[in-house]
Amino acid sequence: MTARPLSELVEPGWARALQPVAEQVARMGQFLRAEIAAGRRYLPAGPNVLRAFTYPFDEVKVLIVGQDPYPTPGHAVGLSFSVAPDVSPLPRSLANIFQEYTADLGHPPPSCGDLTPWAQRGVLLLNRVLTVRPSNPASHRGKGWEPVTECAIRALTARQQPLVAILWGRDASTLKPILAQGNCVAIESPHPSPLSASRGFFGSRPFSRANKLLAEMGADEIDWRLP
């Protein structure tokens, strides 16, 4: 992650939204460069660390919260739960998300694990922690990303525009007090991880429920279809 002003790294609306934590973002850039200098790598690749914030801030209608990036090299792409088009087999959590997507919406299974179309249509795919050390899950938790992503979520709620937050798992559910401050409705269920998907994630119908809630708030629905 290069040492550049926030306005050169993210979409203009996000640059304004994240201005209160601009110095913290810069500190995290220093942290990542120090990791590289010490011979330690991080995921996703530098240009993708802030990728979730490169899509228009004002167009976000749905928030899907992840914990931290996939630690498997080649998987993390800067959007929560998404992977590059050539990744096979899919991470188990993403495979379970697609199983629920098909059951909920009746669409055929997607051809790959790339969730970029969702990001382009107003779905913020945001991890609470934006980087991880390869093969070392949760290794960058508590290093300083949490204030950045919480600022992002507070900025979304402050817009007073319709927002549906899809919260999978206990970690994501801790965001409810922040989300309650705006025109936001939360959909909660267990995490799609193989450890918990059968305890209420399957059958939770998050995609159709999100669209129903958006319609009730007077907003356009999300086109969830993936190629």
Swiss-Prot record:
Gene Ontology BP terms: base-excision repair, AP site formation via deaminated base removal
Residues annotated as the enzyme's active site: 68 (proton acceptor)
Family annotation (Gene3D superfamilies): Uracil-DNA glycosylase-like domain (3.40.470.10)
Swiss-Prot/TrEMBL catalytic activity: Hydrolyzes single-stranded DNA or mismatched double-stranded DNA and polynucleotides, releasing free uracil
GO MF terms held by the record: uracil DNA N-glycosylase activity
EC identifiers of the protein: 3.2.2.27
Keywords annotated in UniProt: Cytoplasm, DNA damage, DNA repair, Hydrolase
InterPro entries linked to this entry: UDG_fam1, Ura-DNA_Glyclase_AS, Uracil-DNA_glycosylase-like, Uracil-DNA_glycosylase-like_sf
Entry function: Excises uracil residues from the DNA which can arise as a result of misincorporation of dUMP residues by DNA polymerase or due to deamination of cytosine.
Residue ranges the record marks as coiled coil: none
Species in which this protein is naturally found: Mycobacterium avium (strain 104)
HAMAP family noted in UniProt: UDG
Similarity comment text for this entry: Belongs to the uracil-DNA glycosylase (UDG) superfamily. UNG family.
Record-given protein name: Uracil-DNA glycosylase
Keyword DNA damage recorded: yes
Keyword ATP-binding among record annotations: no
Domain of life: Bacteria
GO cellular component: cytoplasm
UniProt-listed Pfam families: UDG (PF03167)
Subcellular location: Cytoplasm
